[in-house]
């Protein structure tokens, strides 16, 4: 069943499923689609690019999901994501905050944004999540499904 509540929400899942727990973002997106999140609103990325700002600027809301190395309470964290003019000296690591800043500067609007970070522990080449990452993913998915729309 299609989830109409998320019709104007974009989900940007960041990571690399070929590097174990770095695939947490993509696994979260897969679960969201299974729950009815519109597949055309799900974007899998190895990393964000400045070009993503155009698509993001037209959304009502955007959710960024990524793995992190930091041990977070409960294994994951959901936090507001605000625009920031801080850009690294590489296009390989453009942050969600920087993309939101570009949205505001170029397109004159910036959607409400949330960042979901999920703790992982294994980053070697290979597919599949560690047991710890899989548990943290389950916790994050549970919070996502119980969050009011």
What are these regions (language model features)?
Residues 1-120, 127-139, 143-149:
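N-terminal catalytic or cofactor-binding beta/alpha core of small enzyme domains
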């Amino acid at each position: 069943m299609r989830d109409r509540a998320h019709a104007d929400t974009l989900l940007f899942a960041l990571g690399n499923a070929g590097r174990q727990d770095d695939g947490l973002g993509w696994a979260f997106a897969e679960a969201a689609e299974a729950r009815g999140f519109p597949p055309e609103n799900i974007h899998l990325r190895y990393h964000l690019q400045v070009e993503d700002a155009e698509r993001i600027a037209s959304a009502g809301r955007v959710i960024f999901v990524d793995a992190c190395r930091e041990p977070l309470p409960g294994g994951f964290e959901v936090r507001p994501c605000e625009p920031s003019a801080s850009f690294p000296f590489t296009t390989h690591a453009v942050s969600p905050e920087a993309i939101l800043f570009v949205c505001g500067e170029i397109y004159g609007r910036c959607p409400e944004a949330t960042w979901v970070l999920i703790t992982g522990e294994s980053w070697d080449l290979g597919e599949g999540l560690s047991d710890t990452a899989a548990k943290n993913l389950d916790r994050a998915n549970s919070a996502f499904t119980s969050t009011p729309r």
